[in-house]
């Protein structure tokens, strides 16, 4: 039915805030997960949003640098659209600076209110980066009551990295094999009362995190404004009838 005009209404909700922090370095293109680590991650994130209720989500992507791809929002449709566009080209500097990514995510939550929502960071990476301040960043997050759940994607055996049909090689001309690095991810989770989960081709591990989040204490989220359309069906019908009546009267005058 036709809808015209709009109105705004405020909706109070209770839930948690979650920042997804996704590794988009070239090593995430390794194919020990199908079709590769990054594409498998994007698929899992898409499904994650289907399992959330009144929670708010944001997205940080990182490699050697970190970028807020999506600020905290309750619009899951928008979040899905942004997550589907994730690619290594979003970050100009290659590498895996987990510390910078965690620091940026920590600063990207909304401000606390009187009854703040629980805050969670979900870090998805193959863990190949150096420490580079990651533990310190995790400890700072813990001081603010933020829990970090880490998901390791990849296999201990690893896989080569293919870009544009060619495999990446090192300075010696040997093929680079990217392997899952778990110790750092375990330490980050332990520092924040979170948990580390090793992904498999069957399950990235986000389902387990959703179950944990759903059992967390909820807090007040900022009032959300939704734009709604007013039903105008009856007015359009009325206008159409008036136009038809005028046309009938004009024709009647022309044909006495």
Task: List each model region and its residues.
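Extracytoplasmic/secreted cell-surface and envelope-processing proteins
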Residues: 29-31, 68-70, 129-134, 158-161, ...
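Short, hinge-like loop/turn segments at secondary-structure boundaries
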Residues: 75-78, 166-169, 214-217
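VWA/integrin I-like adhesion module and closely mimicked acidic/polar interface patches used
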Residues: 92-96, 107, 112, 117-120, ...
